[in-house]
């Protein structure tokens, strides 16, 4: 897991600093707080926030893992892969890997998400339907030229895990980062 102290974080209140204080009035449910209505939904419902990749790479990768030597898990994973291809044909879905590849410690398949709408539909669906499998959801952050900003951070500090977190071998990512910094 990433050490949070390695990174800087802008204030979440940037752009909201000079607004009136929020109230403490409780909603009719008796638990949640009432928020001031603006009549305008966040732009994040329609477009991912920068620096998420809005180009060919996609804003999020979802890696769905299975233990390749566990026959039941491998069968479930292949069935899930097929179901996703049938139910979400608009998503980019890669081949079904039967062995570890890249930084991934076990076999997996990958799905790319390009829009908040796709993310909002697929991630809750996967929460319910992933069965015994673990899934890594990580962003693809890019600079203004569309080059990846920090793959290591995207795979660690910014990652979301469903199920058991698996250790990734990020040595290749780190080497590429060092080579890029040297040039």
Curated annotation (Swiss-Prot):
Entry coiled-coil feature ranges: none
Gene3D superfamilies, A to Z: DOPA-like domains (3.30.70.1240)
Family of this protein: To A.muscaria DOPA 4,5-dioxygenase.
Official protein name in the record: Uncharacterized 21.2 kDa protein
